[in-house]
Amino acid sequence: MADLLSDGELVFVGLNSHHALLAAAVAKILHRKRIRVVTVAEGYEPSLADLPVRRSTGDPELARIGTVLPTVEAFDLAQKGKVDVMFLGPAQVDGETNINVSVIGSLESPKVRLPGGAAAAFIFPLVRKAVLWNFRHSVRSLVRRVDFVTATARNASNDVLLCTDLCLMRYDRERKAWRLASIHPWSSKEEVLGSTGFEVIADAGFVVTRAPTEEERELIARLDPDGLRL
């Protein structure tokens, strides 16, 4: 996911987004990208090189080692179009960019209650680039229709990407469908399509995802000694 970040971007990392925080660290520390990071713990530009990943990326330590930026201010930045990237980790994603972090099953009688979307419905369509991540790629998480629409970018014009443990997809607004952008080295087109509950455009345009370097692996292992990313 670090490769999806670019110079000059303001990046918002949400709650329990360990993968997103590590991606930002790799992009900033190793790739030398001039990104600015805002966390849900109200930390602005925390020193990522000095911070081991905790069980919650809402850890106030993130604010202590950086400037405090109240969450309401981050929302104002999104409203003004100044948040370039937001990472979101939904339990379900469907073929229209609808995401679900609310309930599995019906709202009236849910099988599972999820953490909720906070301001996802507000921010998701406003950021210039939304990076969704779900590292349990299956027909249960990438579904034909989410059980509950917590947020959507269906009627927006922003760039929306979906990173899983099998591939990277980008939403094609002209075709109104997800397009396969890259397949991870350990996966295949057949596995991706067979594990996805919605239509995926899988023409000849996709590539093989770059494997992480040894230096990247070492940094990730140092920042996440407890393996919370796994």
What are these regions (language model features)?
Residues 1-21, 25, 158-176, 199-230:
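Intrinsically disordered, low-complexity segments enriched in small residues
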Residues 1-64:
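N-terminal active-site beta-alpha-beta segment that forms phosphate/nucleotide-binding
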Residues 39, 123, 218-222:
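Alpha-helix boundary/capping detector
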Residues 51-212:
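Conserved phosphate- and dinucleotide-binding cores of soluble alpha/beta proteins
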